[in-house]
UniProtKB/Swiss-Prot annotation:
Its EC number is 7.1.1.-. It is a peripheral membrane protein. Pfam families: Fer4_7 (PF12838). Belongs to the complex I 23 kDa subunit family. The keyword Repeat applies. Disulfide bonds: none annotated. NDH-1 is composed of 14 different subunits. Subunits NuoA, H, J, K, L, M, N constitute the membrane sector of the complex. Its main location: membrane. This is NADH-quinone oxidoreductase subunit I 1. It catalyses: a quinone + NADH + 5 H(+)(in) = a quinol + NAD(+) + 4 H(+)(out). The gene is nuoI1. Its cofactor is [4Fe-4S] cluster.
Length: 200
């Protein structure tokens, strides 16, 4: 009959070995970062604040499909889609994201929403300073998330590029706003033709 191995207790050596790691760390140079005075640059593919992208002519890429909201494990994204009209067009397709909100009190910056987006409308920037003392300020709206306008862009809503359709936008055939493109009146947002800076 084989002898059973004797069970050995934790003994005295295990706690000493654990404290040995702590004791060694006491004499190492501390790596203190002087933040925010000295900020390190983030990696190019850093997962920071989200951004809603635009087409080269200024129309929005978001089509209000809500796939990003379904993919979010923290339930931090709220999207409400609406239909485009010829009088008020925000994206080249049939629909656009009328309401878009991201709650950064819940968001874990995992990037699953980016992978789910079929139009590459949603990407992540390198901005990471999102802390705020108010929970309400941590809910970013579409206006806060929407990318800025470049020189060859016209703010939405406006008509699509003449002679182009939705597929041409996604093929990259539209590279700038058509000459003479003017911003349409956003009636859904309460604008009127006589509002300053808005033309009928």
């Amino acid at each position: 009959m084989a002898e059973e191995p004797k069970e050995t207790g934790p003994g005295f050596q295990n706690p000493v070995a654990g404290f040995g790691v702590t004791f060694k760390a006491m004499f190492k140079k501390r790596l203190t970062e002087q933040y925010p005075e000295q900020q390190k640059t983030t990696a190019p593919r850093f997962h920071g604040r989200h951004q809603l992208n635009r087409h080269p002519d200024g129309l929005e890429k978001c089509v209000g499909c809500e796939l990003c909201a379904w993919a979010c494990p923290a339930d931090a994204i709220y999207v409400e889609g609406a239909d485009n009209t010829d009088e008020e067009r925000y994206s080249p397709g049939e629909r656009y994201g009328r309401v878009y909100q991201i709650n950064y009190a819940r968001c874990i910056l995992c990037g699953l929403c980016i992978e789910a987006c079929p139009t590459r409308a949603l990407t992540m920037t390198n901005e990471f300073e999102l802390a705020d003392s108010s929970r309400a300020n941590l809910i970013y709206t579409k206006e806060q998330l929407l990318a800025g306008l470049d020189d060859n862009m016209v703010d939405s809503p406006h008509a699509i590029y003449p002679g182009m359709d939705e597929q041409d936008y996604y093929r990259g055939l539209v590279t700038e706003a058509a000459p003479g493109t003017e911003r349409q009146v956003a009636v859904s947002k309460g604008e009127k033709p006589q509002d300053e800076g808005v033309e009928a």
